[in-house]
Each structure stands twice: as C-alpha cells, then as structure tokens.
C-alpha cells in the first residue's frame, strides 16, 4: 500500500486539476516499463491512494510567506514499506516530478522550473515493518506482495513463454520478465529454473514451495 500526499498552495489546483494530477501520480509511480503482470499492477493501483492538501500557511526558509503571485511550490510525500524505499526512490522522485511538470504545463506555467529550481520537493518515506495496517491487521512488505499477487498466480503460471527473448523467464509470483543472465535471484524447483525480479518475490515463492534459501 502506497500513500501519496501532495501539498500545494491554496487555489492553485481546481477540482479537475486535482483529479487529473492524482491519476497522473498513480500512473507515474506504477510505471509502464518492465511491468509486472497487468492484473498485479491493477491490484497495486487499487492499494495506492493520493491525498491533496492545501496548507493554511506556507513559509519558506527565507521566513516569508509564499506569495500567491509567485510560481507555486509543491511538496510530495510518498509513504511506502521501508523495504521498498531504496529501490523505488530514484524512480519515484523523477516520475512524480514529471507528473507535476505536466500539470504545470497544462496550467500555462513553466514546467522546466521544477527541475531547475527547488520548487518541487519529493520525500520518499519508508514505513517500518509492522507499522502499516490493512484489513484490521499489520501488513509487512511481504504480506502486501502476497496480497497483490496471490489471486493472479494461476493466470501468471499460464502465461505463454513462446515469445520471450532467449535466456529470460517470467517471475512466477508477479509476472515480470526476468533476464537470467543479469540476475542471481533464481530458484530451481522440480527441475525448472525460476527467476525473480526481486528478493521478496523469491522469498514468497520459496516459502510456498518449502525451499530453504541459503542466500
């Protein structure tokens, strides 16, 4: 589960702009390159929420209120399981800044300033294991991946591999295509070599098949 909070000066974003920006931010964070199985991505989107805030006061470091006539400042705070933070930070900062820039361009403001000046701050905050709850109980990062992928495992197992590039396989947990030549995240089960996009998918698969992990 990921929560994206957007802080913007009052009046900068109208209702339609807030809705469009929220959709943009979710699409930007989920991405399209190297995507997991579509159904898994839909589950991830369903667990992603965007909240837009308009603070009553906005003071900058030079101790003056933000002037409504100035180009608007933004703060985006992304809360995600701590185990995901390091891997997702660079991607999130780049993509979310771009989503804001597209919104600025639509409003007739200079989108390039968001990369040239510190007008868009992005914080990726890792939530400690056991500190995120859903369905009335704590949910760790492994629990969330399990929740998002479990309903789709049978469909992932039936995905055709006929058109895959040589040396690649489909991650049996999330459906991502994995290059066996560039990863050591593999497991052999019943004579079949499986590859995984990250260690958590590998851990889930190993636990479900009773395979001990030595590394």
Task: Walk through the language-model features, giving the residues of each.
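Short, hydrophobic beta-strand segments
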Residues: 2-9, 72-84
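Short, flexible, mixed-charge glycine/proline-rich loop motifs
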Residues: 157-168, 188-189
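Short metal-binding segments enriched for Cys and/or His
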Residues: 198-215
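Short linker/helix segments within small regulatory modules
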Residues: 184-193
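Short, solvent-exposed beta-alpha or beta-beta edge segments that form flexible loop/patches at the rim
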Residues: 46-70
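Short, low-complexity, polybasic intrinsically disordered segments
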Residues: 60-67, 130-153
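Short, non-transmembrane amphipathic alpha-helical segments
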Residues: 21-33, 92-112
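Short cysteine-rich clusters marking metal-coordination/redox-active sites
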Residues: 171-175
């Amino acid at each position: 589960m990921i929560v994206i909070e957007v802080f913007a000066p009052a009046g900068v974003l109208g209702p339609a702009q807030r809705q469009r920006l929220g959709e943009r931010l979710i699409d930007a964070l989920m991405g399209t390159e190297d995507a997991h199985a579509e159904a898994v991505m839909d589950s991830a989107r369903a667990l992603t929420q965007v909240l837009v805030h308009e603070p009553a006061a906005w003071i900058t470091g030079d101790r003056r209120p933000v002037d409504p006539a100035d180009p608007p400042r933004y703060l985006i705070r992304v809360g995600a399981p701590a185990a995901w933070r390091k891997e997702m930070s660079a991607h999130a900062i780049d993509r979310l800044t771009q989503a804001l820039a597209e919104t600025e361009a639509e409003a007739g403001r200079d989108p390039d300033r968001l990369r040239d000046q510190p007008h868009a701050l992005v914080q990726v905050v890792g939530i400690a294991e056991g500190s995120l709850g859903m369905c009335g109980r704590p949910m760790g990062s492994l629990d969330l991946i399990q929740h998002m992928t479990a309903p789709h495992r049978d469909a992932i197992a039936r995905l055709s591999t006929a058109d895959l590039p040589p040396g690649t396989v489909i991650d049996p947990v999330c459906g991502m295509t994995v290059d066996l030549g560039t990863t050591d995240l593999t497991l052999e089960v019943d004579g079949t070599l499986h590859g995984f996009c990250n260690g958590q998918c590998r851990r889930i698969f190993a636990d479900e098949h009773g395979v001990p992990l030595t590394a």
